[in-house]
Amino acid sequence: MSGWPVLPALLLAVAMSSFHSATSRDEERNRLLMREKMMQVGGQLVLQEEEERANGRLQALKEAEMQEAKRTGIFPPSLHFFQAKGLMEKSAVFNILKKMPKGAALHVHDFGMVSMDWLVKNATYRPYCYFCLTPKGATQFKFAHPPPPTPKQEECSEWVLLEKFRKGLPNVTEFDNSLLRTFTLMTENPQETYANQDMVWKKFKTIFFAISGLVNYAPVFRDFIFLGLEEFYQDQVLYLELRAMLYPVYELNGMVHSREWSVRTYEEVARTFAKTHPGFIGIKLIYSDHRSKDVSLIKESVQRAMELRAKFPQMVAGFDLVGREDTGHSLYDYKEALMIPASRGVKLPYFFHAGETDWQGTSADRNLLDALILNSTRIGHGFALSKHPAVWADAWRKDIPLEVCPISNQVLKLVSDLRNHPAAVLMATGYPMVISSDDPAAFGAKGLSYDFYEAFMGLGGLTADLRTLKQLAMNSIRYSALSETEKKVAMETWEERWHRFVAELTRGPK
């Protein structure tokens, strides 16, 4: 019987061991969670007391939306943007993000920055606006007085005065709606309308062909720039860097302006805009050309970019190549042209689109290698970066950020559910990035808020919080082409607005 008292002691020892084991497991788990939280974008930031309260409210709303999405099976980032947009606009989180000071938009194409609705309702209603149809059914516009000469039959039908054409229509609204459909990718059934990438890119290209005759008309051009700045300013964006191809801008009498005139016009409009918009920081242009062109033409473009930057150092930030990577020339194809500045000892910053593809091992995929080798200041999209561990490591070491455009990547069919976007992994590891919107008008969006929502809810999941948003906004200034002095002023302006935003978020709805 003397052995019996030993049993409770053994049981107690086992229980204590299990308790310590469970405790150590919990501690280890918490340490892992904390390490991951510290690693993610914004994880190193320490929030002030008021920011913590604001974060608590934001995360409560976010969690409620996610719980509702789990219950209903309807989660906007998992849906195509055209079907998710209306749901997003009802979201409490989205409406908070609309008020959030976002800093800068660093990946926006000039022709895609203004609501297409304005082009239809304003630009096409101006006097002397003509249109014609190409043999393939594409619409082309031109302002002219006297009327433009009859085009060649293989190029376009006869020019028709739009004002006169509308007068003969039984339903002008339906015609205007058809124009709007021509100017955007928006459709009720995107999966059916755009069954593959070729189809969506084909329509995408026709949009810019259609609107070019409107936007490049000098009076529209000025108003277009101003309105683009207005739309982003209303969305709490104070600075933009625009990819601009600087197509010839023309007057009513047919006179065509130089690229220098266009750059000066951007400069003048931005200066005028700043006078009536407190806190607006400005714009810079990234001169761009199309990657479908021959090497000899890209050599000329690089030369032109150097000249424009020398003439407008405060306005022209650098050079990029635009257009679909999968079907265009690779950066490697253009290496001879792209080495010209370095061979002449001229600094021409590059802001290359690279890796906007889901075809691994192709020349488009390997654009990431050449963007790194050519010291691209930032990388546009970089969708394929996670498939290139060496490039990923070296680009991170060089502090080369990605310009992530979630909606663009989804609409152009690189990814369907944004929770599966490769930038979700990059965001979790803390890779430097900014959020931008590419061609928001073509997607039926405005400004940056829609992309921020997709990034915050879809890419970041529940772990992304106010720190993530704050870091992304700060990154947009840090990785901009502004000078160090300009960045300091921009950051101060942003911080002032950020504090107001946090105070309002803490107070909650009135």
UniProtKB/Swiss-Prot annotation:
Region feature (PRB domain): 122-182
Sites carrying sugar chains: N122, N171, N375
Signal peptide: 1-24
Binding site for Zn(2+): H107, H109, H353, D438
Gene Ontology MF terms: adenosine deaminase activity; adenosine receptor binding; heparin binding; proteoglycan binding; zinc ion binding
Annotated GO CC locations: extracellular space
A single BP term in Gene Ontology: inosine biosynthetic process
Entry remark concerning the domains of this protein: The PRB domain is involved in receptor binding, and may be responsible for the cytokine-like growth factor activity due to it's sharing of several structural properties with chemokines. High-affinity binding to heparin/glycosaminoclycan (GAG) is mediated by a large, highly positively charged surface at the interface of dimer's subunits involving approximately residues 25-40, 386-393, and 419-425.
Protein name according to UniProt: Adenosine deaminase 2
Gene that encodes the chain: ADA2
